[in-house]
Each structure stands twice: as C-alpha cells, then as structure tokens.
Swiss-Prot record:
Belongs to the heat shock protein 70 family. GO terms for cellular component: virion component. This is Movement protein Hsp70h. One of its GO terms (molecular function) is ATP binding. It comes from Lettuce infectious yellows virus (isolate United States/92) (LIYV).
Length: 554
C-alpha cells in the first residue's frame, strides 16, 4: 500500500478529491463523475452515504436523513445566524445550540439532529477514505481549500474539523490560490493570474504573481453568498412567475435545466414535483442569460476592484468552478477581459483545478520547487485607548505575518484589547474577533518594556500575545470569545462502494456469464490497471448494459 498526500476541494454543491502519486494524478470518481455532490445521508444503522448515491437513495428501501448546504453554515454563530438564515432559506431545520449550528436534515424515514461540524467531518472522512480504497492508498497528509473571503470564525471552524479527522492535515488553502498553483504549472508563459472562482455557493477572485520560484497571492476579493445556488434560485423565480407554479421546484431539476440549456439546444423541460405531478416548461438560452447576468455583474465588480487597485494591465483571467462553465458567464467575463488587456482561459480542468492545486502543492513544497506566499483576506484593527481604531494588519498583507507594538510599563493599567476584522468604517459593523482583559502587572514590572504581538498564521488565524522585552517571556492572551473546537464524537460506518469496488463487482458478475471476463480477476488489487482495461471495453456503463442484457434482475 502506497502513501499519498491528498488535495480536497470541499465545495458548496460539489466536492473533488485527488492525490498526486509518482507524478500521476488520481481522482475519486463516484457514479462515473469526479464531481461528488456535497451532501450526506445518515441511516438509523449509522451508515454515512455521500454524493449522488445519497441524493437518489430511496426512503422506502433505506430510511435515512438527508443533509446538504453543509459549507454554507461553516463558522455561523450567534452574530451571523439570522443573516445566514435569510440568505440560505433552508428547507430543513437549522438551529443554534450553545452558539453552534445544528441541522435536522430532510426526513426520509429517519430523523437525526447533528452539528454542522459533525456532518462535515463525516463527509470528509468518507470522501477521503473512498479515494484511498479506490487506489489502495494510505493517506498521510491533507490540504483542504476554503473560500478566499472566509473570515477568522469560518477558518477556525474549518480547522477544528480538520484537527478532528483520523488523518493529519497540513494546511488550509484559499480556493483561488490552490487553483493558481495548478494553473501556474500549466501556463508558465504568464506572470500574473486573476483566478476567477465562481462555484456553487461562493465567489472568489485572487491576483497571483509569479517570479522565478516565487508564487505569491497579491490581492483577493470575494463574496461568501454569491454562486450557482443564486442562479438556480433566479431560474426558479423566473419559471414560477412565467408559469404561475405554486409548488417548490426540486433543486435537481433546476440544476438539470441550467446545465442542459447551457450545453445543448434543448429548451423544453419536464419537471417532476415531489408530489408526483408534472410541469412542462420552456426555457431558452436567452432566458438563461437573463437569469445569470445580475450575478456575473456582481462578480465582475469584484474583479475590477482587484484590477484597479493593483493597476493590472496584462495577465490572464483563469476561470475556475462549476458556475464558470456557463456560457453567459464566460461571454461576460471575456468581454470584460478585452477592455483591460487581459486574456481569458477556460481550461478543461477548471472544475478540478482547486483540488489538483491542493494536491500539487504537497509535491512542490516537499521538493522546494516553489516558495508559495498567501495573503490575508480582510484587514484587522485594534480598538485601543479612547476607542480609536488602529489598523494592525492591512489588506493585502503576505502571511504568515507578525505585527509588534512596543510599549513601556509606566504605571499599572487594566484594560481590554479588542480586535475587529473587516473594512467597514463603522467599526461595530465588522467582526469582533478578540476581546482580552489585560492587567499590565501580569506581564511586566513598572519601568520595563513589553510588546503586544499580533500573529497572523498561514491559515488566516489571528493570535494575540504579550512579550516582556526584558525577560523575553511570551504570554498568549485568552480570548473571551473562544469556543471549544471539540467535536462530539460520533462514528459512522463506511458501506459505500467506490467506482473501483463497483468495477470489481461488475466484472465478477460478468465472469459468471462470460468466462472471458475471468482474466480481469487478477487486476482487482491493481485498480488503476483494472480501470484502464475496463475503459478499453467501453467503461462501466457499457459493461453494466451488457450485464442487464444477460440477467433480467439487473
């Protein structure tokens, strides 16, 4: 069994997991797709089933509780819960329990309430274990992506989940930064990359610069509530108004209408509602463009902020994320690029680029092929004496970064250090990150010098410390807002099969009917070769149709 270091793009609607082993990229495929729906079904027996298999699972045959929207709840707390509820408008129960969001999923014969952290942990454990079992690998490290616009609370929540996994995590990487690592290796002739990451629920843009072996994130912008889900909702509202539909259009049909309208000339669609009723609708490419336009315009405004701020006149806009596949999105961004002297690249791997970048970064850093430097997403300010906000970490700033403020202990003082994250000029509208009580006599004698030390780590997490400049002793200040990062342990069973397991089962069944398939039995322990040999015969779907023709039970 070979060791592997994994790259995970944990997305709002779809996730992708990959690993680079001996310069070959291995990707988990479920249902013949590398884009695994970010949803999970939990059964009464404790089985966890993810992706498309969870979406189509019948409640009559297998009672379960169905969860989705996991990423949209990351880092939501008492201060942001109402805002998140208004944005997400969940069709399931979401509630705060001691400052943490718990979800009660869609009841399909079974109901259970779990924390968002428990659900995300179960999903990540399952998707990574399926990758490992597919290629007979042992996971020894993980890089996971997060939206560049994530604030400290969201990054802390993400890191607490990763710390609880059964395998180690190296780092959290901003999604556009991960994509940039991949595209820098694919397009070495460019020095500046604007990574346009339009996903299912979030939008990010990052400006990446390359100089020799240095790859640095220069600037970033984003919106944690702008993505494909907004386009789906716009399509739903449009169809409801056009046909006076009184029922909720299932999300799967909205996604299907959007995808087929974009990729084919089809304009007539049939919607099957949850109650079994049917509605035929007409939806054209021009109507798709009308629904998409407002959201792309919002994304272009964010791109332009980065372009203008950095006086960018050359480079490439590299499109990433599932929503970037939409033709109206590409057309509008291409039109914008032409006005700024930029080149648009819509790569065939745009949906996988973030995961691939996370995987590639392991190798590049291990071999010291590049020096990768990220930057912060939001400025930080300290509300000190007289309630005057003092910027301590501007945006953009290369991270990790340490800011030191030297002070002299002239007299004993009791005060509070308050740190806010955000760029709103009205400071209370920003995120209140840290509130620490300080008694200066705890850290220095009268007459001694001491320093406030603000540490911003590679994952975007801030820590406040006091250093006595005479003794050199460092004190980490407790944060009154700190929440426990412990996740209530709950163990789920992995009963789901990977594509490789499916192929082995299918080949065994075919071998019963046709002895020619017995030659594949010896390949069950070398899954990559098995997959290649089966692909030569037309792939899983072709062989499955062949089995159905041999046995009516299939």
């Amino acid at each position: 069994m070979r060791d592997c270091k994994v790259g995970l793009d944990f997305g709002t609607t779809f996730s992708t997991v990959s690993t680079l082993v001996n310069n070959s990229m291995y990707v988990l495929r479920l249902g013949d797709s590398a884009y695994i729906p970010t949803c999970i079904a939990i059964t009464p027996g404790g089985e966890a089933i993810i992706g498309g298999a969870a979406e189509v699972l019948s409640g009559d045959d297998t009672p379960h509780c169905f969860f989705y929207d996991l990423k949209r709840w990351v880092g939501v707390d008492d201060n942001t819960f109402k805002f998140a509820m208004n944005k997400i408008r969940p069709k399931y129960v979401a509630e705060l329990v001691e400052g943490e969001v718990y979800l009660t999923g869609i009841n399909k014969g079974f109901s259970i309430k779990l924390s968002v952290k428990q659900l995300i942990k179960a999903y990540i454990e399952t998707i990574v274990r399926l990758l490992a079992s597919s290629y007979s690998l042992r996971v020894i490290d993980l890089n996971q992506s997060v939206p560049a616009d994530y604030k400290n609370a969201q990054r802390l929540a993400a890191r607490s989940v990763l710390k609880a996994l059964s395998f180690p995590c190296r780092r959290i990487i901003n999604e556009p930064s991960a994509a940039a690592v991949y595209c820098v290796s694919r397009y070495p002739n460019y020095n500046y990359f604007l990574v346009y990451d339009f996903g299912g629920g979030t939008f990010d843009v990052s400006l990446i610069g390359k100089y020799k072996s240095y790859v640095t994130v220069i600037d970033t912008e984003g919106d944690s509530f702008l993505g494909g889900r907004d386009i789906d909702k716009s399509i739903e509202d449009y169809l409801v108004g056009k046909y006076n539909i009184k029922k909720v259009i299932p999300a799967t049909y909205l996604a299907l209408i959007k995808e087929e309208c974009n990729n084919t000339n089809k304009s007539i669609f049939t919607i099957l509602f949850d109650d079994g009723s049917v509605q035929v609708v007409e939806f054209s490419k021009s109507e798709l463009e009308k629904c998409v336009r407002p959201f792309v315009e919002r994304s272009i405004k964010l791109i332009n902020d980065v372009v203008v701020r950095n006086k960018l006149t050359s480079g490439v806009i590299y499109m990433v994320g599932g929503s970037s596949l939409l033709q109206p999105v590409q057309d509008m961004v291409r039109s914008y690029a032409s006005t700024k002297g930029l080149t648009l690249v819509a790569d065939q791997d745009m949906r996988s680029a973030v995961s691939y970048g996370c995987s590639v970064l392991h190798k590049l850093e291990d071999n010291k092929e590049i020096v990768y430097i990220d930057c912060n997403s939001h400025p930080l300010s300290d509300i000190s004496f007289n309630c005057d906000p003092e910027p301590i970490i501007r945006k953009p700033m290369s991270i990790p970064y340490t800011h030191t403020v030297k002070m002299r202990h002239d007299r004993p003082l009791k005060t509070i250090v308050n740190i806010y994250e955000g760029s709103n000029l009205f400071m209370p509208e920003n995120d209140w990150l840290i509130s620490s009580n300080i008694n200066t006599t705890d850290f220095a004698k009268v007459g001694e010098e001491y320093s406030k030390v603000y540490e911003y780590d590679i994952d975007g997490i801030i820590t406040l410390k006091i250093r006595n400049e005479v003794t050199g002793k460092m004190f980490t200040l407790p944060n009154s807002f700190t929440k426990s990062d412990n996740i209530k342990p709950i163990t789920f069973k992995l009963t789901q099969l990977s594509n490789t397991d499916d192929l082995a089962t299918l080949t065994s069944l075919l071998g019963y009917h046709d002895k020619n398939f017995e030659r594949f039995y010896g390949l069950f322990n070398v899954p990559t070769i098995l997959i290649k040999e089966i692909d030569k015969l037309g792939g899983f779907k072709t062989l499955y149709r062949r089995l159905k023709s041999m046995n009516a039970n299939f």
